């Protein structure tokens, strides 16, 4: 097992790019068919929502670096639009932005059909989802990824977006719900 100076196993790091430059993540996304790893995030009102709280509903998890980037903001707007037509489905938009910033963005943009969650204090994302960027200018933020979970808590779709500045494949993610 190779390790870097911060003791992350570099044998299992995923590779993506940011503006064409290679960066790595702290691991790999869990596989389709696996139980979705538990995590919790902070809402704009500072209450905590845990993934297991949503068992019985389908869940789309939109992970992204920061709402302060055009692509991330666009992904939240798009999932908000799509979520309005989804039955028994919750869409979580997850980043390390502070909950106050997420709340301000959602209010300003009229985002009402998704739940913004901040994982600014959740270290478990690193080990359970492997999507924290390990190097480069966005080190410490989340890579762009989408995970879709069925009503039993199993992953039915996952995508780690190869280029962080690209939007996720909305069509494929939403098709997993059909």
Whereabouts are the PLM-identified features?
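Chalcogenol-based redox active-site neighborhoods
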Residues: 2-178
